[in-house]
């Protein structure tokens, strides 16, 4: 008599039923900010593309970058114009900080997250593993 409830066969059967995305180990790489200094302003040419890649609201993302850099700025089409001179390294560092805090899941490390509001608290909810982490509001 064959044992259908053998642990290894159950484990194999369970793994076969999982979607392929679970086993993919794709590194999430944000496009580098295409920024340059013009006079006393820093312009990020591909800002909206970066926000779209992360699936975040460009206005909220811009608010975070401006707050972190301690400056004012304005969205103009697909560009973000910041008051002040900032090097590309500093701009990319702030973008990476945003990704680590507001995009990547702290449990599984995947970028499949959404920011949801429950009551007065904002949470980073992972659609891949279901984890929820409270995040600071912008």
From Swiss-Prot:
SUPFAM superfamilies: Translation initiation factor 2 beta, aIF2beta, N-terminal domain (SSF100966), Zinc-binding domain of translation initiation factor 2 beta (SSF75689). Gene3D superfamilies: 3.30.30.170. It comes from the Archaea. InterPro entries: IF2/IF5 (IPR045196), TIF2_bsu_arc (IPR004458), Transl_init_fac_IF2/IF5_dom (IPR002735), Transl_init_fac_IF2/IF5_N (IPR016189), Transl_init_fac_IF2/IF5_Zn-bd (IPR016190). GO terms for molecular function: translation initiation factor activity. eIF-2 functions in the early steps of protein synthesis by forming a ternary complex with GTP and initiator tRNA. Heterotrimer composed of an alpha, a beta and a gamma chain. Belongs to the eIF-2-beta/eIF-5 family. This is Translation initiation factor 2 subunit beta. It comes from Methanococcus maripaludis (strain DSM 14266 / JCM 13030 / NBRC 101832 / S2 / LL). The lineage of its organism: Archaea, Methanobacteriati, Methanobacteriota, Methanomada group, Methanococci.
């Amino acid at each position: 008599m064959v044992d259908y409830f053998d642990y290894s066969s159950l484990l194999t059967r369970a793994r076969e039923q999982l979607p392929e995305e679970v086993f993919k180990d794709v590194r999430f790489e944000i496009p580098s900010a295409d920024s340059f200094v013009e006079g006393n302003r820093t312009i990020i040419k591909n800002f909206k593309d970066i926000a779209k890649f992360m699936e975040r609201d460009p206005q909220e993302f811009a608010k975070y970058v401006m707050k972190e850099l301690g400056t004012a700025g304005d969205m103009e089409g697909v560009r973000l114009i910041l008051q002040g001179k900032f090097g590309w390294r500093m701009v990319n560092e702030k973008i990476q900080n945003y990704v680590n805090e507001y995009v990547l899941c702290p449990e599984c490390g995947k970028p499949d997250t959404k920011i949801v509001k429950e009551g007065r608290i904002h949470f980073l909810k992972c659609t891949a593993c279901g984890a929820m982490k409270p995040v600071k509001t912008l």
